[in-house]
Amino acid sequence: MPAPSVVEAILRIDRAAFGDEWMMDQQTFREALHATQRARIFVSHDDGELTGFVIAGVTDSYGFIQRLAVHPDFQRHGVAGSLVQNSLSWIHSRGCRSTVVNTEVSNDAALSIYEKNGFVPLDYNLLVMERQLSV
């Protein structure tokens, strides 16, 4: 687990990148790190400031890009592509032959990054559903 100051910086970037609807909290962050047999966080910096991160994980044969976020001030500067490339190199070094990622169908920026890094859409229909609960 990274130092608390790094976790806070990662969560700040995540909030800035995703807003309230999809943002991670500390519990979700821990779950992402423990969702696979082994996970690693790659970060990017600019003048000592954390600008983006990716959480990558591996199982026996598959790699996963579990979370990718870049602060809006640093988007469209190659940060996300570099983070994806670093995570793919690490996943490959762990012996995985395939890597999976998911993103919103309407997220053109993410789709472009993943396609530039060799990802292709799979023929899956995934429906996200929600039920409001009274508090």
Q: What do the predicted segments below correspond to?
A:
Residues E115-Y124:
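Conserved acetyl-CoA-binding loop of GNAT-fold acetyltransferases
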Residues V70, R76-S89, S93, S112-K116:
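Conserved acetyl-CoA-binding loop-helix of GNAT-fold acetyltransferases
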